């Protein structure tokens, strides 16, 4: 089972916000997921991202692949740097 960390669209028409979910790569975008690890609201001026960092790091260390957009969000939050540092220290 290939696992991805990706965005799930929520909200109403023209007012989206996204949940950052861990899901099987074969599941549809807004379909079944394993765990919610954060949220992302692009409508706020600072593009608010909330994350459960320890859970994201755990999923990344277990082999979950982030989508391109999620990878950018994690990089801006500093999570990818922590992941690479922990990977190099092993």
UniProtKB/Swiss-Prot annotation:
This is Small ribosomal subunit protein bS16. Disulfide bonds: none annotated. Keywords: Ribonucleoprotein, Ribosomal protein. The gene is rpsP. GO terms for molecular function: structural constituent of ribosome. GO terms for cellular component: cytoplasm; small ribosomal subunit. Belongs to the bacterial ribosomal protein bS16 family. One of its GO terms (biological process) is translation. HAMAP family: Ribosomal_bS16. InterPro entries: Ribosomal_bS16, Ribosomal_bS16_dom_sf. The keyword Ribonucleoprotein applies. It comes from Lactococcus lactis subsp. cremoris (strain SK11).
């Amino acid at each position: 089972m290939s696992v991805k960390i990706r965005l799930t669209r929520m909200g109403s028409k023209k007012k989206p916000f996204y949940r950052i979910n861990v899901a099987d790569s074969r599941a549809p975008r807004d379909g079944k997921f394993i765990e919610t690890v954060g949220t992302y609201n692009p409508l706020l001026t600072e593009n608010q991202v909330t994350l459960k960092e320890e859970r994201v790091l755990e999923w990344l260390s277990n082999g979950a692949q982030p989508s391109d957009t999620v990878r950018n969000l994690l990089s801006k939050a500093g999570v990818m740097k922590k992941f690479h540092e922990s990977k190099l220290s092993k």
